Amino acid sequence: MKKVVRNRIARLSPLFMATVTLTSCAGVDDNKIEDNPNIIFILADDLGYADISFLGQNKFSTPNIDKLASQGMVFTQHYSGSSVSAPSRSCLITGQHTGHTVIRGNKELPVEGQHPMPSDTYTIFKMLKDNGYKTSVFGKWGLGAPQTEGAPENQSVDEFFGYNCQRIAHNYFPYHLWHNDEKIILEGNKDKNED
């Protein structure tokens, strides 16, 4: 049975697709694992209310998202913490509005990445890890360049795969992605696009 929960946390931000998957952690006491549900949070660019088939889309189907929705909770009224992507993600993972979160713009660093979120920032990832979860992010990060304190591996994210720099995420054929702190070169995209 599908549960639809109305909540005004975050609006879907443009030019961004990230899936935050948080799963129960091994090595915690068995009772705690049973008490902790799996959490899969999908934040997608420009996704309108009726753009998913279980919410009325009839020009194409989204069977995998529909199945996830039928087995869990669906939040249908998310509002962005900011009008631009990095601050919006920062608001989402810190629970703060843009007046308090450190990331207030899409400020870029010279080589690759955005202004880093300080490593002592309390985030949903730290909160979930304190409660026996493993945390993962797949998609666009943009909250700290590689090898900075804002990189996913320094923000309590156990597994990351995707775009560290949001500018590179805007290219259809990116030259590389990141798997944790390892740069993965996409050889097939080399001649199609420049980062």
Protein language model annotation of sequence segments:
Residues K2, L12, L22-D195:
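Formylglycine-dependent sulfatase
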Residues R6-L15:
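Sec-dependent signal peptide recognition
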